[in-house]
Amino acid sequence: EIHFLKLHPSLVREIHLRQVNQMAVRSLVGGCANTQARVIAVGVESGDEWKMLRHLGVHAGQGPWFADPEPLNLPD
């Protein structure tokens, strides 16, 4: 069973300008429609990208648009 489907940053980059990428994401989101899977966009860099991704049905996102990466602090 698939719980999460993460979209590669190359698919997300400038998606608001790329119709082929929009069709691919729409298809992937549609394929997950009757499942428990949540679609997550990785590498979201702008509000325009995020707006389009939400319009296409993407559930969540991560990337510089939301927060800058932080270093991983491991216990000693």
Predicted regions and their residues:
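EAL-family c-di-GMP phosphodiesterase catalytic domain
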Residues: 1-76
